[in-house]
Amino acid sequence: MESHDEIMARLALAEAVAREGGATALSYFNRRETLVVETKYDLQDVVSIADREVEQLIASRIRDAFPADGFLGEESGLQVGESDYTWVVDPIDGTSPFLNGMPSWCVSVAVLRGDVPVIGVIFAPTYQECYVAALGQGATLNGHRLQVDPTRTLQNHVTGFGANSYVSPQQVGEIVAALLSAGGNFIRIGSGALMLAWVAAGRVVGYYEPYMHAWDCLAGYCLVKEAGGWYHPFNTEGDRITKGAQVLAVAPGAEADLRRIAGL
């Protein structure tokens, strides 16, 4: 019971900070032409003051409520905590769509207990959609229960796919060819976190990305699991939580095909 209460207390805060951070991000989105944009890893990996301010806001709220918890943010890195819980936050997943006036971006907030994602909240402000999940509590979208459809397959639905400059053009081509050869089709929107939420919502049958970070995927993983899907575990032990890895989440009807394509 104590563990349940701990999770539910953090769930309430996770949704609150995702919504508050999303409102701040949306205010920047509506005046994005004023933002100064910087590059990180390469010219396609961009960041602005909006990312940093939203992350600082969320981190501050978490620190005030649960000072012993750990925190990993895309912009600020890892602060190891003293409790069993670690918050994993992407303040704006889909910065490129965000900066270019497209709606496909979101705020992603996950909470780990040990190495298990026990809370996942993804808020997409432009759609006014809030996806919420907690261990054993199911997944919801704006309060409505989510459940993946077991009749959906690679062949009768669409698959989400993402890639970045960590993935070679040759590998991207091979994955796309394998998807199409298996009778599937794919979509890419620029936000892996949001596409993972779409797996839970049944909008795509699965999502695969060969190299993704914890802050992009862990909230979505919790959502997919609680909606009845499967995900490939992400190594969160020690500093592995800061490293990229393969990410796959999928509904049951497409699991075998997508695991084969991903080599998992």
PLM regions: where:
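Short coil/turn connectors at secondary-structure junctions
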Residues: 67, 83-84, 115-118, 154-156, ...
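Small-residue (primarily alanine) positions within well-ordered alpha-helices
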Residues: 14, 18-21, 120, 139, ...
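Short loop segments at secondary-structure junctions
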Residues: 112-116, 126, 135-138, 144, ...
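Solvent-exposed alpha-helices and their adjacent loops that cap or buttress functional pockets
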Residues: 39, 79-81, 114, 132, ...
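N-terminal subdomain of lithium-sensitive/metallo-dependent phosphomonoesterases centered on the IMPase/IPPase/PAP
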Residues: 1-92
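DPxDG-like acidic metal-binding loop motif
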Residues: 81-140
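Residue-level signal for inorganic ion chemistry
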Residues: 25, 51, 62, 95, ...
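An extended, acidic
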Residues: 147-264
